[in-house]
Amino acid sequence: MSAFTLYPAIDMRNGKCVRLVQGDYNKETIYGDSPYDMAELFEKEGAEWIHLVDLDGAKEGKRVNDRHVIEIAQKLNLKVEIGGGIRSENDVYEYLSAGVERVILGSSAVSNPPFVKKMLKQYGEKIAIGLDARNGFVSTEGWLETSTLKATELGKELANEGAEVFIFTDIATDGMLSGPNVKSTVELAKETGKSVIASGGVSSVADLEALARNEADGVSGAIIGKALYTNQFTLSEALERVKRK
């Protein structure tokens, strides 16, 4: 069994499963009324992990869809990682103590480094750093802001503070089904020497295989969203192929 992990994604907005194009809240497609039902479907297809995003939370800077997150973590046999709207120690504590496996800190890595460093010290690899980049520069606040900070620079800095897992999203490819940015993902893994999960742009099983070929360099998994919802391939197909690589 390959260690390369596939993370089916459920993006939640107003309690529903949605997809946005390049993080644009005006370009939303609803794919289901129940995040729990969707997660259960992925579990039946063989998922071990699920990647949840609280889009309302990312925009509002506080947890909004946490009820759905906790229900999935407690009732299904899935490891859950959650991002979006996690800004305080209490947010992190409540998710982890409710059975969530990993909490993703994104915007706060730029806006509140002391908080992120403290959480890394306290929880180690239960914390993933979400690095969302536009043209190589870190983007924050639900992708509404772009900073002057390079993703690789921030990655190296946080790796020195104890970050073990990064989730790298290239915003230009997200929701576009145009193929992931393999080059930038590998670059981040090499620069930090840590585990990097790729997010954004996966459109085919071949895309997943292209990422998985870089596992030795630290690319440890891929998040799949729109490709599953638009039936480009099934999760069970993808799991089977990546396992055989």
Swiss-Prot record:
Signal peptide (residue range): none
EC number: 5.3.1.16
PANTHER family in alphabetical order: 1-(5-PHOSPHORIBOSYL)-5-[(5-PHOSPHORIBOSYLAMINO)METHYLIDENEAMINO] IMIDAZOLE-4-CARBOXAMIDE ISOMERASE
SUPFAM superfamilies tied to this protein: Ribulose-phoshate binding barrel (SSF51366)
Example of a GO biological process term: L-histidine biosynthetic process
Molecular functions (GO terms): 1-(5-phosphoribosyl)-5-[(5-phosphoribosylamino)methylideneamino]imidazole-4-carboxamide isomerase activity
Family: Belongs to the HisA/HisF family.
Active site: D11, D132
Localization (cell): Cytoplasm
Top EC class for this record: isomerase
Keyword set, alphabetical order: Amino-acid biosynthesis, Cytoplasm, Histidine biosynthesis, Isomerase
NCBIfam families listed in its UniProt record: 1-(5-phosphoribosyl)-5-[(5-phosphoribosylamino)methylideneamino]imidazole-4-carboxamide isomerase
One GO location term (cellular component): cytoplasm
Record carries keyword Ribosomal protein: no
Organism of provenance: Bacillus subtilis (strain 168)
Pathway: Amino-acid biosynthesis; L-histidine biosynthesis; L-histidine from 5-phospho-alpha-D-ribose 1-diphosphate: step 4/9
Reactions accelerated catalytically: 1-(5-phospho-beta-D-ribosyl)-5-[(5-phospho-beta-D-ribosylamino)methylideneamino]imidazole-4-carboxamide = 5-[(5-phospho-1-deoxy-D-ribulos-1-ylimino)methylamino]-1-(5-phospho-beta-D-ribosyl)imidazole-4-carboxamide
Any matching Pfam family: His_biosynth
Lineage summary: Bacteria, Bacillati, Bacillota, Bacilli, Bacillales
Designated name of the protein: 1-(5-phosphoribosyl)-5-[(5-phosphoribosylamino)methylideneamino] imidazole-4-carboxamide isomerase
